[in-house]
Amino acid sequence: MTLEEGLPSADLIVLATPVDTIPLLTVKILNRIAPHQVVMDTGSIKGELCEVVAMHARRGRFVATHPMWGTEYSGPDAASRGAFAGRTAVICERERSDRDAVETVERLYGALGMPLVSMEPEEHDLHTAYVSHISHVTSFALALTVLEKEREEQHIF
């Protein structure tokens, strides 16, 4: 089924594609939806996306979200039952979305057992960057510490 074939029968359209595809895909879908339809995304970057849709005539039908759950794995094999329960979902620019659209998304996340928080896109992106990169920063700092200690001891691997 193509996007054009499936879109008319959907009440809620969930975008869960690679983050670099979401802004243009969101615009493409907003251009085609009916007034009752809701579009939401699940991408990890919100700043660019929210800028791209800011002036769209159907901006109110879009809810920018990010379920804060994931592993190093992706695809269907990475799925696990109950994975979202107790994990936070972020809604960005809640006030720019129509009330009924936000309520639809809240019901979905509520059914998954996910508490909700609201953030501005820039705040979300900053916090997500911290969380996503903390393991890399920690590993790098540890490696530098070990190398410095080895230099002090004049033993370098």
Identify the residue ranges that each predicted region occupies.
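Glycine-rich nucleotide phosphate-binding loop and flanking beta-alpha elements
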Residues: 20-21, 46, 69, 97
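Rossmann-like NAD(P)(H) cofactor-binding subdomain of soluble oxidoreductases
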Residues: 27-77
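Glycine-rich, N-terminal phosphate-binding loop of Rossmann-like dinucleotide-binding domains
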Residues: 16-18, 43, 93
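Internal alpha-helical scaffold of NAD(P)-dependent oxidoreductase catalytic cores
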Residues: 83-157
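General small-molecule cofactor/ligand-binding pocket signal
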Residues: 1, 63, 117-120
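Structured loop/turn residues at beta-strand edges in well-structured enzyme cores
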Residues: 8, 57-60, 82-85
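Predominantly a Rossmann-like dinucleotide-binding segment in NAD(P)-dependent oxidoreductases
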Residues: 71-89
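Rossmann-like NAD(P)-binding element
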Residues: 3-33, 37-38
